[in-house]
Amino acid sequence: MTQFQITLFKGHPIINDGENVILIDTGAPSTIHNSSNLTFCSDHYNCSINYMGLTVSKISEMLGTEITTLLGADVLSNFKILFDYKNGLVEFDKQEINFNGTEIDISNFMGIPIIELSIDNQNLKFFLDTGAKLSYLSDSITSNYESIGTVEDFYPGVGKFETECFEITTLFGGKNFLVKYGNLPPLLQMTLMLGGTDGIIGFDFFNNFKVLLDLKNNSLKYGH
């Protein structure tokens, strides 16, 4: 078991491991590192330095802080991971993690976890993305709500963009919680449709629930 303090930089979970500054990104299929070899939790991994034109220096620039590593689903799926934002901790283990929560089955697309949430009595599928400070929904749903203003966000491969924001009550595990949603640029909206999902849920989910993620076995445990 390895435990790290999380720094939430603008809602993005970042950990320090020796010389490495790591962004934990369940929304990325592949890990990107500043060299082709990464040692993490005593294991060695071969990594991309450049994934479809993306490097950690480009991601650092968009993020607004320096990272050495974007830790994606290919490496994350080797671990059971407990996210505890309230206490600023994340735990990685190859074995079972003792956590008394409610367990549900989840699915995935290219290793990215997909969960079901409910909005306005509609069951919707969301990519569960620790790398997303803002969550996203299609404008066919957000058009029923008042905008609370615009924010700037970025998405690897697309760069920075502005979006209107909407605060929408969302239901998961019998708990209603407020989520700040934006709308994705059309190209990214198409990616969601390819994955058979309606949106992306990020920071607000992890800020409201303690979450144990087991990507390899498509399982999620949660507690309040």
Question: What residue spans do the PLM features occupy?
Answer:
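Pepsin/retropepsin-fold aspartyl endopeptidases
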Residues: M1-H224
